[in-house]
Amino acid sequence: MSLAELRLEDLRCLERAQLALDPRLNLISGDNGSGKTSLLEAIYLLGRGRSFRTRHTEQLIRHSAPRLWVHGRTLPEPGHTVGIKCDRDHGMQIRIDRAPVSSRAELSEVFPVQIIDPGIHRLVENGPSQRRRWLDWAVFHVEPGFVRHWQSYTQALKQRNAALQSGADPTLWEPELIRCGEALTLARSRLMSELQPHWAGARDSLGAVGASMSFFQGWSRDFTLAQSLERHRLHDQERGLTSMGPHRFEVLLRLDGRAVREILSRGQQKLLGVAMAVAMTRYIAQAARRTPTLLLDDPAAELDIARTEALLGVVRGLGAQLVVTALRPEQTPLGMPNAVFHVEQGKVKRL
């Protein structure tokens, strides 16, 4: 899948832009601060319903504008149209094929997109929440019913926590919590197992350290989820929240028995983060028969020449639509771009 057309208004420093993208390699050049990364944000917004730079979408609105608007059209034909409007006062509105949708998950179904940017080390360095989103995004693409189970589990978890805090009976919500929680855990565990060869291949081809990747389900494997909820019920009542369950799952990255974020440099963490993105792109392409569009924001940042060339070599072999930023076109040795755009002072033109 790929993005054929991007149109936007009032996103960060970009007042208005329209790009006809190629399904292969697209290069966006321009000085720092010109708006290159903002174009990637617009594309990412179409596939994820959020920015990769901030949790607050309203921060993307150009300072003098009341709202932003982004529109995209996907391939292959007949494709889909995606429209997103974000208003300072009324939040975000999403439309797919002109019909309003309430869930951002529906965006990923029509336009899957991944980002490799200078901050990708945070996928390794930060706490578990980013790795949870990374894994669940992929599970959504390959497991029918995952979103439905996730929504039901989240609702049951809220109700159980409310009961724990109010002194009501928390067991009323446990059957639904267990039913949906076990389905979530099975789907996540299965994907993690199937992902392993893609992870090892991406990690090794990039020359990253040989870190292992494993899955912690959110409670001890010595007990069922029902047993774990029962064992921790008194503790949960004292704390007013559910301490064990699929909402506490983690993707663990370890080297010699230690968490890699404790022992690796920023550059090494970045390589592992890139390997995670590449591995997931390969997996989705194989398992879901759809190849995500891959965004690369300044791929040479913080990597030496050898590692940059290794990254670009791996990326070239994915068969994905690529949208890459660089200060100058010659700084991205990916071969001849199929489309080149230049951004200057918030204005975009095709070269």
PLM regions: where:
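Nucleotide-state sensing region of NTPase/ATPase domains
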Residues: Y44-Q130, D136-F146, S193-G201, E230-L234
